[in-house]
Amino acid sequence: MPTFVDRVVLHATAGDGGHGCASIHREKFKPLGGPDGGDGGRGGDVRLVVDPSVTTLLDFHFHPHQRASRGRPGQGSNRHGADGADLVLPVPDGTVVLTEDGEQIIDLVGPGSAFVLARGGRGGRGNAALASARRKAPGFAELGEPGEQLDAVLELKTVADVALVGFPSAGKSSLVSVLSAAKPKIADYPFTTLVPNLGVAQAGDRPPYTVADVPGLIPGASEGRGLGLEFLRHIERCSVIVHVLDCATLEPGRDPMTDLDVIEAELAAYSADLSDRPRLVVLNKIDVPDAAELAELVAPELRARDLAVFAVSTATRRGVHALSLALADLVAQHRAAAPARAATRIVLRPRAVNEPDFTVRPLGDGFLITGSKPERWVRQTDFTNDEAIGFLADRLARLGVEKELARLGATAGAEVTIGEVTFDWEPTLSGGGLGNGGLGVDDHPGGDGLAETGPGGRGPAGTAASGAAPSPGRGGDTGSSVSLGPRGTDDRLRASVRLTRAERMARRAAAVVDPAVRGEPAGRGEEEG
């Protein structure tokens, strides 16, 4: 079972928004209580937060699917649903978030830095929020918007001050163990170290610094040979690079200078940014016979390259203290020159400047409508409710969708796709008639431009349908005007019907008691915008 994981694929799902509620207030002696359906709660976000106590992505290796809680639905009596709890995922310092194609999204460095990986869906508005002067008691509510889903690649680039690089069995793990209190696995065979080992070193009264032992590099590591490609990224953030050269190994074609040139070539091939990092050279294992003489032989040539050289024995700890002091000074210089990083909370939701509300383009024999507003409106519409469909049609008409379809030559019956929903378009005779009626009320047969609308266009029973016979008026009483016939036509029939106050109250009461609005949650929702 792995104990160190530095790359995982995370499947994050934010919480859905809670559904809005369609409810009518019921109280003794209040026959016209009005709508009182509450809004649904917002879904929880999925957030990544840097936690200094976390050093690996192991938890996500075993649990790659993470889901936040959804918002609670609204209820009657204007009770709003509770928001879903955010899902906070602790990640190590230095975690990079990538798309599946390898494009970097964000680089999280610094304790407390946070990133909203998936945003929760908006809660749906209840019918109390949807009421207007023309729509006194809406018989529908909005649906909760689904939470975002994202598959992201998390990569850990260790945040270490000093990186030890070198060939396998050069003594890097042994050097970490004497510089710090870390206890890495040490053995006398190549590739003993399979994961980076981190240690915290303290040199005298200098500030502490971190040391990372990178698994052994071999020629071709930057191209994927050996283990180098998997762990070369852990060198990217280091302040100082330390070449650990083995002075005791006698192999054909290998010597300290050759090893140095090979490792430098691999670092340059991996990233040009590493060329400006300060470097030190450690000539290791000088306690072995003949190793000290070899170290003295190559030291002048290394110094000629402007490299600081330290002859070290991890077995006897000779030269270790001087090396630690030099590393502490270099790290302190780098920290003083680097700008301080502050913990940040990042939410990336870029939007183009002057982005249109919607676009219409041909799609086969039909048309495809894209845009954040129409797509969101479709997601939050309850297509089992005729009144909700009429409300959607009015919103699209006011946005200018019908006029744009007519301009592009759309004919009756053409398929119009918005998001995941496809409609059969039924244009009004004069075009643009959708914007002339009441908000969310379809008082004409088929005149809302959407084939889903039910007979008569009105949703709940008890409301006047197209073609209904006007009630006889009573002279002298204050009345209200009822619009009959297809909306948006040139020969629209308007009949002014004089109704007594008692008759108007009776009609409103009939609409209020309609079975479609019994106070149960009827939809899901979000905020209009």
From Swiss-Prot:
The keyword Electron transport does not apply. Residues 2-159 form the Obg domain. Keywords: Cytoplasm, GTP-binding, Hydrolase, Magnesium, Metal-binding, Nucleotide-binding. Its cofactor is Mg(2+). GO terms for biological process: ribosome biogenesis. Residues 461-472, 508-520 have a biased composition (Low complexity). Residues 160-332 form the OBG-type G domain. SUPFAM superfamilies: Obg GTP-binding protein C-terminal domain (SSF102741), Obg GTP-binding protein N-terminal domain (SSF82051), P-loop containing nucleoside triphosphate hydrolases (SSF52540). Residues 350-427 form the OCT domain. GO terms for cellular component: cytoplasm. GTP binds at residues 166-173, 191-195, 213-216, 284-287, 313-315. Mg(2+) binds at S173, T193. It is found in: Cytoplasm. Its EC number is 3.6.5.-. One of its GO terms (molecular function) is GTPase activity. Residues 62-86, 434-494, 506-529 are annotated as: Disordered. CDD domains: Obg. Its main location: cytoplasm. It is an enzyme of class 3 (hydrolase). It comes from the Bacteria. It holds the Pfam family GTP1_OBG. Belongs to the TRAFAC class OBG-HflX-like GTPase superfamily. OBG GTPase family. Monomer. An essential GTPase which binds GTP, GDP and possibly (p)ppGpp with moderate affinity, with high nucleotide exchange rates and a fairly low GTP hydrolysis rate. Plays a role in control of the cell cycle, stress response, ribosome biogenesis and in those bacteria that undergo differentiation, in morphogenesis control. NCBIfam families: Obg_CgtA, Obg_CgtA_exten, PRK12296.1, PRK12297.1, PRK12299.1. This is GTPase Obg. It comes from Frankia casuarinae (strain DSM 45818 / CECT 9043 / HFP020203 / CcI3).
